[in-house]
């Protein structure tokens, strides 16, 4: 006799110490738990809540291999599974791709493969890798996933006495017996996941678990980084690498970008078409009159590759796709923090202090002027950074920030080589914008605009709202949170890039246009500056808090995720990036 798939009655339940609290049946308004998330919950509750409850996604090597293993089983059309009322006891067949749901069980599933043997239906779940050497033939998470599929088949009226797992690498099939214990474990996992997601609670990360290194959500979960705030040390080095994919910039007027198979095709009048694999693209940045076809937009949306739309002058206009998790949990916490004056002010104090300290570090490392002037500037910035940590009001912080900016930019010309300072075109007196009046300010403005776009994208992918900040005020067209996060990165990413291209002679005096009192880079110079910025993102740094090495590109992603963890309450404070 098949084990029961009904939650046990009160008389059947164990003692209070072992009490399993079952969620009520789902309604039409409730989300149903995918069978794969039953697997995830038993493997790691935090993984299941992040992926299903918070809508977080990430592609890993194992995930891609799993997709290929599934595709390998699809050799052609198969017959449809007959209705249970007409399925004969002597009927046998194989079929694929069946969707089942049950509000009573609170479950839903996409079944990979179904075997029908003499009227008995057997769900077959395909797994990449080899069969594990355990007595049950497979680990509990995988067996529970198959069990959930079997319960859905029973609920639909089919006879299902067992399930199966197919391990693609070792090419072995393992029978999953639907024991009473497995059914209960599956129902409890389903119920626990539904109740946890409904509560809005995010389970803590596993503690230095061997499960973490191969988890696709490791770069999102950040278990060791979060543990650092409890232990003061971190066990894993280095962090997961950033994706090898890079941004695609389109800025030639009249250029057209379309889709062909698994590539984007770039067409520019008078030039040969160029193709770029979609797997090699992390985001698309379009500046000015560059067109993107509808099929290309659809494919980018499916792959969750963001598209940033910029003006010809690289003012950020908006974005398509890449909006991060399909959940409002992190943003809800973000809006709550924005209304918490104490926490918001503490964040702002650390932010301004970090910005000043990073500017001071850039001056200290790149100074080419008189030593006496250097020490005066460094001492003033050190005092202002310290004052920022005790500022009581936003107005006071703004005053400190403004004073520090004046000291910093007054000293900025001392960072240029003599070859640059002797050129009148590169004379720099103060920071100006809208429009920038000289070549140095034009370079700074472009780098700041591109950096704002980079951070806006990273914040959105982390589940945050780039338009709602904690320090910068909200204005139309101004991504306040991106401008918050940019402060500590301005000196180390944008300003350092400008110094690099000017001091190395990559951009010269003939690379600028002057009109209406403003100054702008010519197209080739703009491409060169953006390329230098991207090279800077690929350079490695040591995280000042966690001690591991990572690229600046990966650092931005880590910092955006840490900010999401901070606003969600996972960590007590946000560790601003301040290189030693």
Swiss-Prot record:
Entry binding sites for Mn(2+) 2: 401, 472, 487
Assembly mode: Homodimer, forms a heterotetramer with a Cas2 homodimer.
Pfam families: Cas_Cas1 (PF01867), Cas_Cas4 (PF01930)
Name by which UniProt lists this protein: CRISPR-associated exonuclease Cas4/endonuclease Cas1 fusion
Enzyme Commission no: 3.1.-.-, 3.1.12.1
Family per similarity comment: In the N-terminal section; belongs to the CRISPR-associated exonuclease Cas4 family.
Gene3D superfamilies attached to this UniProt entry: 3.90.320.10, CRISPR-associated endonuclease Cas1, C-terminal domain, CRISPR-associated endonuclease Cas1, N-terminal domain
Record: residues binding [4Fe-4S] cluster: 44, 212, 215, 221
């Amino acid at each position: 006799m098949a084990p029961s798939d009904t939650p046990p009655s009160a008389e059947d339940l164990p003692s209070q110490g072992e009490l399993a609290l079952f969620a009520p049946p789902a309604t039409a308004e409730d989300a149903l738990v995918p069978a794969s998330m039953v697997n995830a919950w038993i493997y790691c509750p935090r993984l299941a809540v992040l992926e299903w409850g918070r809508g977080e996604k990430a592609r890993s090597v194992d995930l891609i291999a799993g997709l290929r293993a599934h595709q390998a089983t699809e050799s052609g059309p198969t017959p449809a599974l007959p209705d249970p009322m007409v399925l004969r006891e002597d009927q046998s067949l194989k079929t694929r791709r069946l969707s089942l749901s049950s509000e009573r069980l609170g479950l839903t599933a996409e079944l990979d493969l179904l075997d029908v043997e003499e009227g008995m239906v057997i769900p077959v779940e395909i797994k990449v890798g080899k069969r594990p050497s355990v007595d049950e033939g497979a680990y509990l998470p995988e067996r529970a996933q198959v069990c959930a599929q079997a319960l859905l088949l029973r609920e639909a009226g089919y006879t299902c006495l067992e399930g199966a797992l197919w391990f693609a690498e070792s090419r072995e099939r393992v029978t999953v017996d639907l024991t009473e214990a497995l059914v209960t474990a599956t129902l409890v996992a389903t119920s626990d996941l539904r109740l946890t997601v409904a509560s809005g609670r995010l389970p803590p990360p596993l503690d230095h678990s061997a499960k973490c290194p191969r988890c696709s959500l490791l770069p999102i979960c950040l278990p060791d980084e979060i543990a650092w705030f409890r232990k003061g040390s971190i066990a894993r080095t280095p962090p997961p690498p950033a994706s090898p994919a890079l941004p695609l910039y389109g800025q030639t007027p009249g250029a057209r970008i379309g889709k062909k198979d698994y590539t984007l095709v770039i067409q520019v009048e008078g030039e040969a078409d160029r193709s770029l694999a979609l797997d090699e693209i992390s985001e698309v940045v379009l500046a000015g009159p560059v067109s993107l076809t509808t099929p290309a937009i659809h494919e980018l949306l499916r792959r969750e590759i963001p598209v940033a739309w910029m003006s010809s002058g690289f003012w950020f206009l908006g974005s398509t796709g890449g909006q991060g998790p399909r959940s409002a949990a992190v943003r809800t916490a973000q809006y709550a923090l924005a209304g918490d004056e104490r926490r918001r002010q503490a964040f702002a104090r650390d932010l301004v202090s970090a910005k000043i300290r990073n500017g001071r570090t850039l001056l200290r490392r790149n100074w080419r002027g008189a030593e006496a002037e250097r020490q005066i500037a460094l001492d003033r910035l050190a005092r202002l950074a310290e004052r920022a940590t005790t500022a009581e009001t936003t107005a006071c912080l703004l005053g400190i920030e403004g004073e520090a900016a004046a000291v910093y930019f007054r000293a900025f010309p001392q960072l240029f080589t003599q070859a640059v300072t002797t050129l009148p075109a590169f004379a720099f007196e103060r920071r100006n914008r809208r429009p920038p009046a000289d070549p140095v300010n034009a370079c700074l403005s472009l780098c700041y605009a591109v950096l704002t776009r980079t951070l806006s994208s990273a914040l959105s992918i982390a589940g945050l709202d780039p338009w709602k900040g904690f320090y910068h005020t909200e204005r139309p067209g101004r991504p306040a949170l991106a401008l918050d996060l940019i402060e500590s990165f301005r000196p180390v990413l944008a300003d350092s890039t400008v110094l690099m291209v000017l001091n190395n002679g990559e951009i010269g005096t003939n690379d600028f246009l002057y009109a209406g009192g403003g100054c702008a880079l010519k197209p080739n110079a703009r491409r060169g500056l953006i390329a230098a910025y991207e090279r800077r993102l690929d350079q490695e740094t040591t995280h000042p808090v966690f001690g591991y090495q990572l690229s600046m590109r990966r650092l931005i992603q880590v910092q955006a995720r840490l900010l999401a963890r901070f606003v969600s309450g996972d960590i007590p404070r946000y560790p601003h990036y301040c290189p030693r």
